[in-house]
Amino acid sequence: DALNPKVMETELSGTNLSFVIPEANQLREFVVIQLDKTIPSISAKAAQMVINQNLHGTEQVDMVIISPLAFKSEAERLQKAHEEKDGLIIRIFTPEEIYNEFSSGTPDATAYRRLMKMFYDRNKDNAKAPKYLLLFGDGAFDNRFLTKDWKDVSENERNNMLLTYQTTESLDMYSYPADDYFGFLEDDSENAIYNYNSNKDEYPTSTATLNIGIGRFPVRTRKQATQVVDKIISYMNNSDLGMWKNNLCFIADDGSNADKYDPVHQVDTEQLTIMLEENKNSK
């Protein structure tokens, strides 16, 4: 019962922790926690005032940019360039603003999707529906930076990273982050993010399609943010409209030792190149 949790009586033998429960014809869930890794309780010192905001009152947009405060000036440069060049209506939000309004102040990747779904549900069938989402910041497989992989990453860089959505599997071969999650905006379509079914050794299929285009700038520092915006603005202002823009390079991962370097990604990439070749003259 999720509303009535109980502490199990356990027995520790070396590194093995065991407990006994009576047999039952129902699903029961057990959670193991490390007390030193739990979220600290709120104290008067940690509490702070939340500035009034009203993201729900925002007019419809073509594009949303989610940017840490440290990168906001660079996001504004990009916003201005797209508004002047492409006539887009763009709004920039910090992740904290989104959490405060869409996840009760708690950092939660689903809050990004809820923001976009709000815009989508208002005008899903006309020209005012949202078209693009840009995540202006790198992501991590460990959203809370608890693993040793992040011990050498500075606090400033951590603060400049945006959350990722990840599949429920925790196995190295079948777990992956997916920004696509933020773009499945029809009701219940978020389930299109495939979770590996270990019982059937397969991924389930889905007919859901993305409703917006999604991009991410994997930047962690102000210098990197400036460089990527400079590059994009330079690309937008390039008057050389030659065939070079149709030259594509596909790069595929070769897998890892965990899957014996299965070339599945290379096969998928080759299939994409074939599709492009066959449809290159399509409008």
Spans of model-derived segments:
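Cysteine-dependent hydrolase recognition
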Residues: 1-283
